[in-house]
Design a protein with these regions (language model features):
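Residues forming the flavin
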Residues: 1-203
């Protein structure tokens, strides 16, 4: 879902596996429906990093093991920006084209990391929400917007992103979107993840 536009697909345009879900149901497994959202990806050079609060990486990360050699760690500098009243107003302006508001996207979403449009709806008393701008890698040109996942239409995404400090001239490389997916009821699995109904099938 990008606004009211929707189509069958896997993540990032991959092939849909809806036939697999159908096959599992035909073989006696119960499935349900869940939803997750992704964030717009920004062009790194279009962000004014000097306007933002820098978030430095730790100089030496903690290891899970005391054994082995230390590895060279090249951190990536991230930055903090925030939504504001203009951001929220832009989103409300486009609620008539929001699949979340219009009810076309009604599957259960993540409990602890709601989309930014969901936050605007559920927490109207909040004037601002923190957004972390995270380069995908040190040499990359793509920036991930942590805490800004959305299913809003592209126009709403571009307008709202450009209300953020440091993002007034931002370019969206890939829009955020919501994706609905099937899951198999986990009570149908053994603790070692083999299905109870189909011996030898692990999920």
């Amino acid at each position: 879902f990008i606004g009211l536009t929707s189509y069958k697909s896997g993540p990032l345009g991959m092939v849909s596996v809806s036939g697999l879900s159908k096959s599992l149901r035909e073989n006696g497994l119960k499935t349900g429906r869940l939803r997750t959202d992704t964030t717009p990806r920004l062009l790194a050079d279009s962000v004014d990093w000097d306007m933002l609060d820098r978030q430095e990486s730790i100089s030496e990360p903690e290891s899970f093991s005391h054994f082995g050699q230390k590895r060279v760690y090249k951190g990536v500098i991230c930055a903090l920006t925030r939504t504001n009243a203009d951001t929220h107003e832009v989103m409300r302006k486009y609620f008539d084209r929001s699949p979340l508001v219009q009810g076309t996207l009604d599957s259960e979403g993540p409990r602890y990391c709601p989309s930014i449009d969901d936050k605007v709806i559920r927490f109207p008393e909040k004037d601002t929400h923190p957004i972390f701008l995270e380069p995908i890698n040190p040499e990359g040109r793509e920036v991930y917007m942590q805490n800004f996942s959305t299913s809003m239409c592209l126009e709403a995404q571009l307008e709202s992103v450009r209300t953020l400090k440091g993002c007034g001239s931002a370019h969206i490389l890939r829009p955020g979107y919501a994706i609905e997916y099937d899951f198999v009821d986990p009570t149908q699995l053994y603790p070692w993840l083999e299905t109870r109904k189909i011996p030898g099938l692990f999920l």
